[in-house]
Curated annotation (Swiss-Prot):
Organismal lineage: Bacteria, Pseudomonadati, Pseudomonadota, Gammaproteobacteria, Enterobacterales
GO molecular function, one term: DNA ligase (NAD+) activity
Chain sites annotated for binding NAD(+): D32, E33, E34, Y35, D36, S81, L82, E118, R141, E181, K299, K323
Name of the protein: DNA ligase
Organism, scientific name: Blochmanniella floridana
Known function: DNA ligase that catalyzes the formation of phosphodiester linkages between 5'-phosphoryl and 3'-hydroxyl groups in double-stranded DNA using NAD as a coenzyme and as the energy source for the reaction. It is essential for DNA replication and repair of damaged DNA.
Gene3D superfamilies: 5' to 3' exonuclease, C-terminal subdomain, DNA ligase/mRNA capping enzyme, Helix hairpin bin, Nucleic acid-binding proteins
Keywords annotated in UniProt: DNA damage, DNA repair, DNA replication, Ligase, Magnesium, Manganese, Metal-binding, NAD, Zinc
Gene, per the UniProt record: ligA
Listed cofactors: Mg(2+); Mn(2+)
Length: 594
């Protein structure tokens, strides 16, 4: 029984972490399929052992995934997710359940349930509240009950009306809560990444992440320049004298008349067979669309039936997302390079002949660990099948062994760090996790740690990007984070293409960065296993950096939001002499904790 409890806890922590990355950080670490498998495993365990169910479980609610840098807004009605299906049999089962549940209350035609079929646009869900036709506020999904306030940014998006249109003496609802999707077109996404690349900034991995990151900008002017588009997909709440149609499609047409954009590919069908025809049709035209989609959404059109079927903890019972299978492409493996990460983790990166999957050019694939190279029996020159899982994460599925060339080269697993030459340690024999233990004496780790420290979510030193940090380290001008605060104009003028104005701007950014929240400072330290969420909680628990540094191991082990390994990592990191001296040096740099 203890093993079952441990597995449930591991699944919950993993799902919460993935939801936080997806909704707040705009990052996708696993494919949709992998996420769904984890969620389904947790659902099955909780079904078998119902006494293990908790309110915070991912099966019962959407995790608390709000960005702390944004204010929060409570939705009028919970903003739920959608259950996903991936094959015809699951669609038929969905239709069968709908008919069974409705037949208990209504005399329905068993063969002619009316469905509204829509494209599943790959973007960010948005809730907008109008009061007497005027936009009051807008919020992201958040945890489903409370979302992030993005009103200022939404006001900068042209496709969202600030005031609803009305014809002659038409009555508008006193309150109207609209739900829809914020997304970016393929063309705008390509242009945005070109601009990011030319300015030396990190590009977005996919259009969904670009839309999410653009919507959450602290500067609305940046959002305005990102060419975001809004598409309304429903009304979640209304109040007042205005009566709305009992048809979902009828309500969408009404929204369109009021000035809200709706999708051009919506179809109303009777029965489940036309739903399959719509699915197959959309798959054929998918590549021709101006924006990314990852499936279709099927909803019961009758709003009375919707109310009768109700909602689960995570998703409505009257709708489902029918996802497309991942796209596959054949290509050639040209090289495997072993990269040293910020914490010393050695990651194999596979470089391939470029292939286009889902309108994204794939040139390299993260292999995660050495075991993947061994499992796939990879050799340089092999023909490989690449999958863009969930249309997000590139992955090498397998090799075509019969296509292996005579001059294919064996991939040598490193014994020494590619950066500093230190002997690598095997941390996990099962997955062959390799790590360099040289820490900041390793040049690659030092650069990565300094980049992390200066990044936007950490110290947020504007202008201190990868190119600048690489030069500062290579020229011996900085070695530890403390060195950022002893930089002078004279030192900065040693950098390539750096003039007086650039140096003065960067020094001003360093000065501004000294005023920081405790949570951002903890995150900036780069403690293994401590991301933004844990940093926020540690800051809340300990209040000051002195309290955190003086805490004993038992104090960390008692924290409910981290496990034993994370607790030991935090304690060890804070009490390692170099780290301790580094933190003390940073405190002496006159940081102001706000």
């Amino acid at each position: 029984m203890k093993l079952i409890k441990n597995r449930v806890q591991i699944l919950r922590e993993r799902l919460n972490y993935l939801e936080y990355l997806y909704y707040v950080k705009s990052e996708s670490k696993v494919s949709d399929e992998e996420y769904d498998i984890l969620l389904e495993e947790l659902r099955q365990l909780e079904f078998k052992y119902p006494y293990l169910i908790t309110k915070s479980s991912s099966t019962q609610s959407i995790s608390n995934v709000c960005d702390n840098s944004l204010n929060r807004i409570r939705h009028q009605k919970p903003m739920l997710s959608l259950n996903s299906i991936r094959d015809k049999s699951q669609l038929l089962l969905f239709d069968k359940r709908i008919k069974y549940k409705l037949s208990n209350h209504y005399n329905i035609n068993q063969n002619l349930i009316v469905y509204c079929c829509e494209l599943k646009i790959d973007g960010v869900a948005l809730s907008i509240l109008y009061k007497q036709g005027k936009l009051v506020h807008a919020a992201t999904r958040g945890d489903g009950k409370i979302g992030e306030n993005v009103t200022k940014n939404v006001n900068a998006i042209d496709s969202i009306p600030k005031n609803l249109k009305k014809n002659n003496n038409e009555i508008l609802p006193d309150l109207l809560e609209i739900r829809g999707e914020i997304f970016i077109s393929k063309l705008s996404f390509s242009k945005l990444n070109q601009e990011m690349l030319s300015s030396g900034k990190k590009v977005f991995s996919n259009a969904r992440n670009a839309a999410s990151g653009s919507l959450r900008q602290l500067d609305p002017h940046v959002t305005e320049l990102r060419s975001l588009v809004f598409c309304c997909y429903g009304i979640s709440y209304y109040a007042g004298l205005k009566q709305l149609p009992n048809s979902h499609w009828g309500r969408l047409k009404l929204c369109n008349r009021w000035g809200l954009s709706i999708n051009n590919y919506i179809q109303i069908v009777s029965g489940i067979d036309p739903v399959l025809e719509y699915y197959n049709y959309v798959r054929k035209i998918r590549s021709e669309l101006e924006y990314q989609i990852d499936g279709i959404v099927i909803k019961i059109d009758n709003c009375i039936y919707q109310d009768q079927l109700g909602c689960g903890f995570r998703a409505p019972n009257w709708a489902v997302a029918y996802k497309f299978p991942a796209e596959l492409k054949l290509t050639k493996l040209n090289d495997v390079v072993f990269k040293v990460g910020r914490t010393g983790l050695i990651t194999p990166i596979a470089y391939i002949n470029p292939v286009v999957i889902g309108n994204v050019i794939i040139k390299k694939v993260n292999m995660h660990n050495v075991n993947e190279v061994k499992r796939l029996n990879l050799m340089i020159g092999d023909t490989v099948i690449v999958q863009r899982s969930g249309d997000v994460i590139p992955k090498i599925l397998k090799i075509i062994l019969e296509n292996r060339v005579d001059n294919a080269k064996f991939i040598k697993i490193p014994e020494f760090c590619p950066s500093c030459g230190s002997i690598l340690k095997v941390e996990d024999n099962k997955s062959s996790v390799l790590r360099c233990l040289a820490k900041l004496t390793c040049l690659a780790q030092r650069k990565s740690a300094l980049k992390h420290f200066a990044s936007r979510k950490a110290m947020n030193i504007q202008g201190m990007g990868s190119r600048v940090i690489n030069q500062l380290v290579d020229k011996g001008l900085i070695c530890t984070p403390v060195d950022f605060f002893s930089l002078s104009k004279e030192k900065l003028l040693c950098l390539d293409r750096y003039g007086e104005k650039s140096a003065e701007r960067l020094l001003q950014s360093i000065l501004i960065a000294k005023e920081i929240t405790l949570s951002a400072f903890i995150y900036a330290l780069g403690i293994p296993g401590v991301g933004e969420s844990v940093s926020n909680k540690l800051a809340y628990m300990y209040r000051t950096i002195e309290n955190l540094m003086n805490a004993d191991l038992q104090s960390f082990l008692q924290l409910k939001f981290i496990g034993k390994i994370a607790a030991m990592n935090i304690y060890s990191f804070l009490h390692q002499s170099d780290n301790y001296n580094n933190i003390q040096g940073l405190i002496r740099s006159n940081l102001i904790f706000k």
